[in-house]
Amino acid sequence: MILIVGLGNPGKQYEKTRHNIGFDVIDYMANKYNIDVNREKFKGICGEGFIENKKVILLKPLTYMNLSGESIREFVNFYKLEDDEIIVVYDDISLDIGRLRIREKGSAGGHNGIKSIIQNLGGDKFPRVKVGVGQPKDNLVNHVLGKFSKEDREHIEKVIPVVSDAIVEIVKNDAKESMNKFNGVNIE
């Protein structure tokens, strides 16, 4: 079983914000793979299904970004998942809009959601897909909690299917394969 986690914040006011790109990807994958993400469990909303003949759980933690690891830890403990059976997708301000970066492991890089996951899992050896949301011009909080401009939103809507494909490549093969195919790709 593979746990695919999209990071974000619950609530209408956070929908379609930069910080919620992980939720947007989960919604896209749920629709594409016909998985109902509507069950509340372990401080999150989730759905189970199959992608590439592998059982998956799509998860959106409802703990708010900075406590995301609490929800993930409960899933990991209940389903007895290994680190490489967790895939996390989230926003990255160090990447331009339209850029992806897949990693097998690594530090939080200043991202509080990832910091929470590392603390709760006791390690950083889980694959992750970073989605570029651009650098803030001034205030970081206003930037990540802000919505995309119309032009940037249109760009992100083209990026989300590619992010989904990168995640599926990890499910099908592994993070290295996905890195080889998708790192450095710029979606116009």
From Swiss-Prot:
Annotated site residue numbers, Stabilizes the basic form of H active site to accept a proton: 91
PROSITE patterns, alphabetized: PEPT_TRNA_HYDROL_1, PEPT_TRNA_HYDROL_2
GO CC annotation terms, alphabetical: cytoplasm
Gene Ontology annotations of biological process type: protein quality control for misfolded or incompletely synthesized proteins; rescue of stalled ribosome
Keyword list, A-Z: Cytoplasm, Hydrolase, RNA-binding, tRNA-binding
Record-listed tRNA binding positions: 14, 64, 66, 112
A GO molecular function held by the record: peptidyl-tRNA hydrolase activity
Domain of life of the source: Bacteria
Catalytic activity from the UniProt record: an N-acyl-L-alpha-aminoacyl-tRNA + H2O = an N-acyl-L-amino acid + a tRNA + H(+)
Residues at the site labelled Discriminates between blocked and unblocked aminoacyl-tRNA: 9
InterPro entries reported for this sequence: Pept_tRNA_hydro, Pept_tRNA_hydro_CS, Pept_tRNA_hydro_sf
SUPFAM superfamilies linked to this entry: Peptidyl-tRNA hydrolase-like (SSF53178)
Localization (cell): Cytoplasm
EC number annotated for this UniProt entry: 3.1.1.29
Catalytic residues in the record: 19 (proton acceptor)
Pfam families assigned to the protein according to its UniProt record, in alphabetical order: Pept_tRNA_hydro
Protein family per UniProt: Belongs to the PTH family.
Function: Hydrolyzes ribosome-free peptidyl-tRNAs (with 1 or more amino acids incorporated), which drop off the ribosome during protein synthesis, or as a result of ribosome stalling.
HAMAP family for this protein: Pept_tRNA_hydro_bact
Assembly description: Monomer.
NCBIfam families assigned to the protein according to its UniProt record, in alphabetical order: pth
Protein's name in the database: Peptidyl-tRNA hydrolase
